[in-house]
């Protein structure tokens, strides 16, 4: 397969490396090489099985709009753009494009989501979330923390779930879900030691997306089909 990776930062570079290791062809563009998604045209996307985006929220929206409008396939690991999700779904449906997005492409975090849904069923517990990331992460709270909160509230409607965010050094990503009762405390924790986990999930997602009919999927829905 041939993948076009958008973003040459730490995670984007790892995505390109992982894709090559898995035997795929890779082309890569940095944000400056694709200002306003201007480089995402028919000739650029010709022969590309999927685009993988790890850029920034505003750039990701422009990139998705361009790729989906051409009926292309795009995997988006960038977070912080979800206010535009309905618009992206509409473009994908209109132009027969394909979108796979997720607040976190780590398989371990996907398991954390499922465990959180199970723990949220406990009665008489109060829940809170703490997340820590590197100082260059643009969105706070993280998309993963927001997803964890949404999972808890889907099981326990109306419950308050405070999120505490920290930005420290080059932290790869730590999420802690705390369930506290009058009698005890239960914690679920995922601590990323390397961005490679996100890269592997994104590439596996792109491999999966390349074989699907047009549509829009959340990584949470498909990760165990990869």
Where are these regions (language model features)?
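Rossmann-fold NAD(P) dinucleotide-binding segment
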Residues: 41-50, 54-78, 86-88, 93
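Rossmann-fold NAD(P)-binding glycine/threonine-rich loop
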Residues: 65, 78-100, 107-110, 114-119
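Structural motif
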Residues: 6, 54-55, 77-78, 102, ...
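Hydrophobic beta-strand scaffold residues
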Residues: 26, 74-75, 98-99
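C-terminal substrate-binding/catalytic lobe of Rossmann-fold NAD(P)-dependent oxidoreductases
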Residues: 2-6, 10-45, 58, 123-226
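Short, surface-exposed loop/turn motifs that are enriched in glycine and acidic residues
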Residues: 101-109, 134-141
